[in-house]
A protein has these predicted regions:
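Catalytic alpha-helical scaffold of carbohydrate-active enzymes acting on polysaccharides/glycoconjugates
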Residues: 2-194
Length: 194
């Protein structure tokens, strides 16, 4: 299907044009930087999690097939991150006294309470990265809303804090509205524009 170019286009490709707003950062800074660590190990697709197959979307492997059984190499990639990689990153940020935002998948954080406590004790922000990895494109809106509520409840219970950031990662046409309806978020990282 080709879109009729004589009709109004539903996306804003113009934005501010030649007159973008200029942010006034604290202390006269000219740029703001946010360091983000995606913590997803234990939230990826895996038959152990009740999924039809193994993860294939995000991996160090090139174009892996999804297996309808345990994929030991794929599991190993995620296990390294949870068992070793994340601790190495935390030590480096702690050494430099740098703040970190963790995009935490709720089911992944549940599977590693020691790490979740470390994130909180080190003062790092934990933004909600959904319940688990699900492609929400064709999931009913009510299910997506229920998953958002469950993910936020898990984070609140585990950290004692309400997440101020949201990042689904595999969003749907409903996600942004659901985030706005849920309310209380300072930002939504599913939008990559300005």
């Amino acid at each position: 299907m080709i879109y009729d170019t004589t009709l109004p286009y539903p996306r804003d490709l113009i934005g501010y044009g030649q007159n973008p707003p200029h942010a006034q950062w604290p202390g006269g800074a000219r740029i703001a930087v946010q360091f983000v660590l995606n913590y997803e190990e234990g939230g990826e697709n895996a038959v152990l999690h009740g999924d039809a197959g193994s993860e294939q979307f995000l991996s160090e492997m090139f174009n892996p097939a999804s297996y309808p059984e345990r994929h030991m190499s794929m599991e190993g990639i995620y296990e390294y991150g949870a068992r070793a990689g994340v601790w190495r990153i935390l030590r480096e940020f702690e050494k430099r006294k740098l703040p970190l935002t963790v995009f935490g998948v709720s089911n992944a954080l549940q599977r590693h309470p020691e790490l979740t406590r470390a994130f909180v004790e080190l003062g790092h922000e934990i933004a909600c990265h959904g319940l688990k990895w699900i492609h929400y494109q064709h999931i009913p809106e009510a299910v997506e809303r229920a998953h958002m509520q469950e993910a936020m409840d898990i984070l609140q219970r585990m950290t004692g804090q309400r997440a101020l950031g949201w990042y689904t990662g595999r969003d749907s046409p409903n996600t942004r509205r659901l985030v706005a309806d849920y309310g209380g978020f300072a930002y939504d990282s599913d939008y990559y524009g300005d």
